[in-house]
């Protein structure tokens, strides 16, 4: 259902962010990212990344936080953001709305990405080894992450459908949408929801670094592989930053070296060993699934 209040609040916040003086300066490279995790984590990661880009490209680079996935796509479409870290679905949505945009790179882990399904321990549900076991989630309180998340909604819903489970089969004939992977963990861990789906990397990071946050959770199932996150850039950056800028930008990202201390800090925060080349055609299957589930029209 359309929520007018939410739309107006989101729109006003979006306007206030993108009306900042930095947006009137054509010589500032504006970096954005989908808010898939806690904002403190994102701020640290992308401010560090932006600082390195600025150093190597010799231009001012500014990280601009956004309030939700839609704001990231909108900011890119309106050219208020120049370079954005998108998930598979949001990247496809952004590129379809922004002619001549360019896929710059993906992490080494993004060619073979996975989601996980987790359940609250109180359910005493055993983990499954076959997709058909997802039927055990019927009639439970289930939450996805953001409505436009690839690893927290699109692909989990796709796999659920493959097992014959639709949103109407959950308790109350609906699913929750936590907004981020961290929030999904918190909601299922607290018992507010019985089960949820999220990014496998975020799950593993929380297991390792925040054991209290996952103390009431059990891993239920790991999905098959699919392609996910990627950097997407505007196609006209050279008009503002000079000939060869896009190629140089791509080179800087691809050449981040885990053997260099400052680069390792960045790569560690992306849970990657390196960035690799990526092409838009790799995301064709994501687009097809997005259309099937009415996330792309």
Swiss-Prot record:
Main location: periplasm
Cystine bridges: none
Localization, UniProt: Periplasm
Keyword Signal: yes
Endpoints of the signal sequence: 1-24
Its job: Probably part of the ABC transporter complex PhnD1C1E1. Binds strongly to inorganic phosphite and with very weak affinities to methylphosphonate (MPn) and phosphate.
Name the UniProt record assigns to this protein: Probable ABC transporter phosphite binding protein PhnD1
The gene coding this protein: phnD1
